[in-house]
Amino acid sequence: MTAILERRESQSLWGRFCNWITSTENRLYIGWFGVLMIPTLLTATSVFIIAFIAAPPVDIDGIREPVSGSLLYGNNIISGAIIPTSAAIGLHFYPIWEAASVDEWLYNGGPYELIVLHFLLGVACYMGREWELSFRLGMRPWIAVAYSAPVAAATAVFLIYPIGQGSFSDGMPLGISGTFNFMIVFQAEHNILMHPFHMLGVAGVFGGSLFSAMHGSLVTSSLIRETTENESANEGYRFGQEEETYNIVAAHGYFGRLIFQYASFNNSRSLHFFLAAWPVVGIWFTALGISTMAFNLNGFNFNQSVVDSQGRVINTWADIINRANLGMEVMHERNAHNFPLDLAAIEAPSTNG
């Protein structure tokens, strides 16, 4: 009797790479999205650190008045920022090889565009990696859906808004004070505080914080005691235990009596869906608001003051907001134009004689 033994062909290098990339046994899951995420985020992070420390001033307004943003050029952690790409570049794709020299690339703010584009690609891949890992583990996909809210917000301020305004110089600077400067200028030019989508975003963020604090405090206050009074209550929990760690009936009864019965969830699953959905939907609306205001579909304005029967102005809060917006706009790019855009756009009165 003859036995035929087949030699098992060794798996190709590509096959082993595919198995390693998609293995859920790795300490950190990589996935196919991770193949793109890792180099893009490493590039964005490396260039950000180097530029924040040592980048030379950038001609952000395109008027040959460079603005310094790095630590070595006089800034500190609060005032430092990666200055957006120059208005002279506009929306042009501006990699290093498009500039005549590295000095020119730095002067025109090339690092900002490099960081932003790599960062957005990286966080989008991170979101895809969340979905990919959930899929391979047999989980539902809602973690990636929740993460889409900050991804949408980042895309709105770093990409959609510059596209709508016609230049990457209008993007948000990458720094603490630069972020606040962006917010102030955005209010001056678009009246974002009077935009309903921004209001929904505020409700989402602050409401989410409130609900998170309420949920955490209710759970912590209704733990099922498994320890003595001399031990921490946290020691009564063992990772993976099947038993409930808190009494949802007690928490439901407390909150129902504190407010009213139907203000309290009696279903843990619907409760946690609500905790996730509220801030996510709010931030989605904020990102949508930024994206619409990018194309100058601005917040409500009340430029026509209320007047009485004699034609005298009755001052309202709207008048104060309008004056504040004009003041902020005057301070913005003060050397690029002499008047706020709202005033400069008004047709000059005709004169006779």
Swiss-Prot record:
InterPro entries: D1/D2, Photo_II_D1/D2_sf, Photo_RC_L/M, Photo_RC_L/M_CS, PSII_D1. One of its GO terms (cellular component) is chloroplast thylakoid membrane. Chlorophyll a PD1 binds at residue 198. Keywords: Acetylation, Calcium, Chlorophyll, Chloroplast, Chromophore, Electron transport, Herbicide resistance, Iron, Magnesium, Manganese, Membrane, Metal-binding, Oxidoreductase, Phosphoprotein, Photosynthesis, Photosystem II, Plastid, Thylakoid, Transmembrane, Transmembrane helix, Transport. A quinone binds at residues 215, 264-265. The record marks 190 as: Stabilizes free radical intermediate. PROSITE patterns: REACTION_CENTER. The record marks 161 as: Tyrosine radical intermediate. Belongs to the reaction center PufL/M/PsbA/D family. Photosystem II (PSII) is a light-driven water:plastoquinone oxidoreductase that uses light energy to abstract electrons from H(2)O, generating O(2) and a proton gradient subsequently used for ATP formation. It consists of a core antenna complex that captures photons, and an electron transfer chain that converts photonic excitation into a charge separation. The D1/D2 (PsbA/PsbD) reaction center heterodimer binds P680, the primary electron donor of PSII as well as several subsequent electron acceptors. This is Photosystem II protein D1. The gene is psbA.
